[in-house]
Regions:
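Sec-dependent N-terminal signal peptides
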Residues: 3-15
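Short, composition-biased motifs enriched in small/polar/acidic residues
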Residues: 176-249
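Generic detection of short hydrophobic beta-strand segments and adjacent strand-loop junctions
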Residues: 127, 148, 167-173, 221, ...
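Short, charge- and proline-biased low-complexity linear segments
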Residues: 149-160, 221-228
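Short, hydrophobic beta-strand segments
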Residues: 138-143, 233-235
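Contiguous segments within soluble domain cores/interaction surfaces
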Residues: 18-137, 153, 158-176
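Short tyrosine-centred short linear motifs in exposed loops/low-complexity segments
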Residues: 136, 144-148, 152, 198, ...
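Hydrophobic residues positioned within well-ordered beta-strands of beta-sheet architectures
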Residues: 138, 150, 167-169, 190, ...
């Protein structure tokens, strides 16, 4: 019987709709800008070469990524008519040695990056892009897993409004679930503990030099419910097999 080499690669990718943070007028002070939106974001790891979002087809992967959009299209807030809002970064905390980065539309590398522990104001980015008040194709990335706490504020480049109150968003650069594997005769047995509200594909590759990963059809679109998922894959005729788990929303 031939020896069979099987190796696990665990990777994560998100293809979901994204959240928004509104930039508008503060309801308690009509002369001040305000930020309204989620305080928590999940940043899943996107392997190199894997798709992340239809809005970022050029994204190369290799980072924990989150597609959070700042917009002047308001619902919870009143619009800040006549303003040209820009988002400043007030502070960044997170894993030691980690970087928090912003990707502008069309970027193939970070537009700017700040190390964790950043203590002061940074210019950030304009909310409107070429007149588009709802700019798609931007992303935030983190290069190490862990919890990042980023504080933002909105300022008006035309000085018609005072800067907003600071808003802190927690980004969880989530490690993928561990994939356990064992050999049972001519089959590889794999299992992992899924996460609720996330989905999974098990992919296989027989030659890493090719860079070609293929979904195992019977183990695709697995719905996570916080339970243990058990899978098998026949390895007959394949002396070398590599597996990776793709997690997405």
């Amino acid at each position: 019987m031939k020896n069979i080499l099987f190796v696990i690669f665990i990777s994560v990718v998100s293809l979901s709709a994204h959240d928004h943070i509104e930039v508008g007028v503060d309801s308690e002070d009509p002369e001040r800008l305000a930020l309204s939106g989620p305080d928590f974001q999940l940043a899943l790891y996107v392997p190199r070469g894997e798709p992340f979002s239809s809005y970022l087809p050029q994204f190369p992967g290799g980072w924990h990524a989150c597609e959070l959009t700042f917009t002047t299209e308001t619902n919870a807030l009143e619009p800040a008519g006549g303003a040209e809002p820009r988002i400043e970064i007030v502070s960044v905390t997170g894993p030691v040695g980690g970087d928090f980065a912003f990707w502008e539309v069309g970027a193939v590398e970070p537009t700017w990056s700040l190390p964790t522990g950043w203590p002061g104001l940074f210019g950030g980015f304009s909310v409107a892009l070429n007149g588009d008040t709802h700019a798609h194709g931007r992303a935030f990335t983190m290069d190490k897993p862990g919890i990042y706490t980023v504080t933002f504020r909105a300022v008006d480049d035309l000085d018609q409004f005072k800067p907003s109150v600071n808003k802190t968003v927690t980004f969880n650069a989530l490690q993928p679930p561990n994939l356990s594997v064992s050999l049972d005769g001519g089959n590889v047995k794999l299992s992992f503990t899924s996460r609720a509200n996330l989905n999974y594909d098990l992919q296989v590759c027989t030659d890493l030099r090719s860079g070609v990963w293929t979904n195992i059809e019977m183990h695709s679109f697995i719905n996570g419910a916080g339970d243990i998922k058990n899978m098998t894959d026949a390895v007959a005729g394949r002396p070398r097999v590599f597996y990776r788990l793709v997690e997405y929303r």
